[in-house]
Each structure stands twice: as C-alpha cells, then as structure tokens.
UniProtKB/Swiss-Prot annotation:
GO biological process: translation
InterPro entries cross-referenced by the UniProt entry: Ribosomal_uL3, Ribosomal_uL3_bac/org-type, Ribosomal_uL3_CS, Transl_B-barrel_sf
Region annotated Disordered, chain positions: 119-147
Subunit structure: Part of the 50S ribosomal subunit. Forms a cluster with proteins L14 and L19.
A single GO molecular function term of this UniProt record: structural constituent of ribosome
UniProt GO cellular component terms: cytosolic large ribosomal subunit
General function of this protein: One of the primary rRNA binding proteins, it binds directly near the 3'-end of the 23S rRNA, where it nucleates assembly of the 50S subunit.
Protein family (similarity comment): Belongs to the universal ribosomal protein uL3 family.
Organism for this UniProt entry: Lactobacillus acidophilus (strain ATCC 700396 / NCK56 / N2 / NCFM)
UniProt protein name: Large ribosomal subunit protein uL3
UniProt key word Transmembrane: no
Cysteine-cysteine disulfides: none
Tagged with keyword Ribonucleoprotein: yes
Amino acid sequence: MTKGILGRKVGMTQIFTKDGILVPVTVVEATPNVVMQVKTVESDGYEAVQLGYQDKREVLSNKPEKGHADKAKTSPKRFIREIRGVELKDYEVGSEVTVDTFKEGDVVNVTGTSRGHGYQGNIKRWGQSRGPETHGSRYHRIPGSMGSIINRVPKGKRLPGHMGVKKVTIENLVIEKVVADKNVLMIKGNVPGAKNSLIVVKTASKAVKADK
C-alpha cells in the first residue's frame, strides 16, 4: 500500500554509506503531518487520506479552514494534500504521520514545484540550437519557422515563454537515511523545487525490484 508524507526541501549534501561509498543526497525536513480527513468511497466517492503540514497563523485563516482543522483538533495548516491508495484503517483523524513511516532503502516518488526562471527564449527553455553567429547569418537565437502550411501557429509549438513553476515528479528515488529525532529524510539524488519549497514523498508505484 502507498505511504506518504509532506515535507520541506532543505538542500543537498553528501553522506557515506556502510560500504564507504560517497552518495549525494537531498535533505527533506518532514515535521509530523496531521491527518485532517479520511475520505471513503461511501462519503466521497474515493479513498484517500488528507494530510496537513506547517501551522498557519489564525489571523491568516478563514472560518472554513478553522472549522476543518477543529475536526482534527489541530491548528489550520498551510499545506494540505491528499494521498491515495493508502490503508485507511491505519489512519485516524487527528493522528500524526512521521518520518518513521519510511525506512532506509524504500523506493519513493518525490513531487515538487520546479524552480522558476521567468521569461526565457527557445534555447534555454527547450534546449534548441542557435544559428551561426557570423558570416552574414541573420538567424541567431530566434524561434525559427512557425510552419509552412496552415495559416496559424500549431498547438504545442515550442516558443519563448514562462519557464519553470511546474508540478514535477521524479520517480524511483531511494531513501538513504532516516533521522527520526530530527524529522529528516535523506533521499539519494536531487528532487524538484527550490530550497524551502513543499515536497510530497510517496511510495513508488512503479518501483523496479532489485535482483536477488
């Protein structure tokens, strides 16, 4: 069954494994999440667990948010996300989900919001090649042809525009270390998002089994 937790991306560092191998890891701080709601097929049409992360000041919370938090006997939360495919009997409204949910060696999917890069051209945004810089060339970094047949720009045409700030999921990352007393997960490799951004860690659904 799926397990999940919400956390904050702290940054990257390096650790040594038991075999003495240096591994780059991303540090994710996941303070205890509160189960805000348990959704069932009978009441909501699907099964899911709603987790809340990071307290939100009362002055910034409206009445519906306060009422929803009161049902879980907690304060309003800044981030609320749903985790599907879980074992509902393992969760109760108001209970906490901690990093102990995972263990070293677990394979997970990590979802975050990619870093924003503002308005960018084709070369940086899509990785296209530039034209010649000299010898009379008039084609340097411009997008190029829009198409030669239809009298409009086709859908999906790669053009300059806003880059980043997209929901990105990286699959099949390995948890190298769990530091329960500091509410920290160390995940091998990099994860999407800027420092201090929200990260959702869930059990990988398409994990590749290791050969015995």
